[in-house]
């Protein structure tokens, strides 16, 4: 009975924090003519893109406008750095819990720096819409936006720690969902479109199809049969129940989240530079540019491999198998096993990333065929994240329930 | 009045950011998703106090910002 209420409390806590995170989006930063600003950015592609992650907070310049983005970006940077700088890698791999905590701490400081920079850029950018633009205003809005971003970061940590699911991805999830109604109305109920009902029907079918494909990709596992010393005596037939599950998509949603967060970078840079040549190059990588999809696919592939290398280390698996006295049939323990696993992982990751990208591509094709506008913001990025986060969270709840059951058994 | 409010706002915001930063979260952020250890967290008492302080200043920050925005 107590475990049930414990789970309920965790879920309640999570929901409460999510509501709080949503609320802050509507508390405006003081001193800005919000109506004028809102009217002017409504058609801006960059702002619309950023709104995906901040749940519309960006166009209202609420105190949580930056959302979880600085934290995600600094996580990306830190993950990359741990691969490059040996000291950091040592922290992550050899120092155990303490080392990882140190890395988390550095990530948070980096997030603070990032948030400060970004909010500085925003406070200069909104200059035309400010009643009284001066140094004090810049200071205040930087402080407000940075604090907002830090609050969101903290809330996400609280959710991960004391609630259920992964805080950061849940916050992104919520922001995407909150943008959905607006996206729908823009796509279908615009006066310029004909055959709305047919298009809507088509859209629903494709939407469901994409969800199904995504679930398959996220859940697909390659089962590598293993045999343990204990089994050997009993029979010569392999026990079908003992296998090593290798997921098709090890990183889960993270490659997509990271890839799409990085995709915002070129769009950002266009706001900063005036150089026409640079601008032309950068526009190629913006949401409507011709190289956008290419970059997106490369990034998905890159982050998939990257994540697999972090989550699954063939050497560790091989060592663990050895410790358990288990091995893969017909493969020698040690180096041969490591090589074998590495090859399989590489192939799996490539397939997984290709699948991910194919799913991401569907909305673009539909858009061309059916001439539905505005599907992009929703389609490519958001749907994968939505499905992934939903599955992840459901799984975590299951894991939680099971682990509580075990706990009560041993007591 | 406005000046005092602004001053209080500055103070609460800075303390808030500071108190969030000195947290030392057990959860490992986005980095290692799916690590199994997150359910075995035991909160230390300093962490508890820190949590309370952070919540307090979070509330103050939201309150002051709202008041300032209304003005």
Swiss-Prot record, chain A:
Membrane disposition: Multi-pass membrane protein
Keywords: Chloroplast, Membrane, Plastid, Protein transport, Thylakoid, Translocation, Transmembrane, Transmembrane helix, Transport
Gene Ontology CC annotations of this record: chloroplast thylakoid membrane
Principal place of residence: plastid
Organism superkingdom: Eukaryota
Location relative to the cell: Plastid, Chloroplast thylakoid membrane
Membrane-spanning residues: 13-33, 52-72, 111-131, 135-155, 163-180, 197-217, 252-272, 291-311, 350-370, 377-397
GO biological process terms on file: intracellular protein transmembrane transport; protein targeting
Pfam family, one: SecY
Its job: The central subunit of the protein translocation channel SecYE. Consists of two halves formed by TMs 1-5 and 6-10. These two domains form a lateral gate at the front which open onto the bilayer between TMs 2 and 7, and are clamped together by SecE at the back. The channel is closed by both a pore ring composed of hydrophobic SecY resides and a short helix (helix 2A) on the extracellular side of the membrane which forms a plug.
Subunit and interaction comment: Component of the plastid Sec protein translocase complex, which is composed of at least SecY, SecE and SecG.
Official protein name in the record: Protein translocase subunit SecY
Species this protein is from: Porphyra purpurea
UniProtKB/Swiss-Prot annotation, chain B:
Localization terms from the record: Plastid, Chloroplast thylakoid membrane
InterPro entries for the chain: SecG
MF annotations from Gene Ontology: protein-transporting ATPase activity
GO CC field: chloroplast thylakoid membrane
Major localization class: plastid
Membrane topology: Multi-pass membrane protein
Keyword DNA-binding: no
Alphabetically ordered keywords of this record: Chloroplast, Membrane, Plastid, Protein transport, Thylakoid, Translocation, Transmembrane, Transmembrane helix, Transport
Domain of life: Eukaryota
Positions of disulphide bridges: none
Residue ranges crossing the lipid bilayer per the database entry: 4-24, 50-70
GO biological process: protein secretion
Protein purpose: Involved in protein export. Participates in an early event of protein translocation across the chloroplast thylakoid membrane (Potential).
Family (UniProt): Belongs to the SecG family.
Protein name: Probable protein-export membrane protein secG
Naturally occurring in which organism (per UniProt): Porphyra purpurea (Red seaweed)
Taxonomy of the source species: Eukaryota, Rhodophyta, Bangiophyceae, Bangiales, Bangiaceae
Gene name, Swiss-Prot/TrEMBL: secG
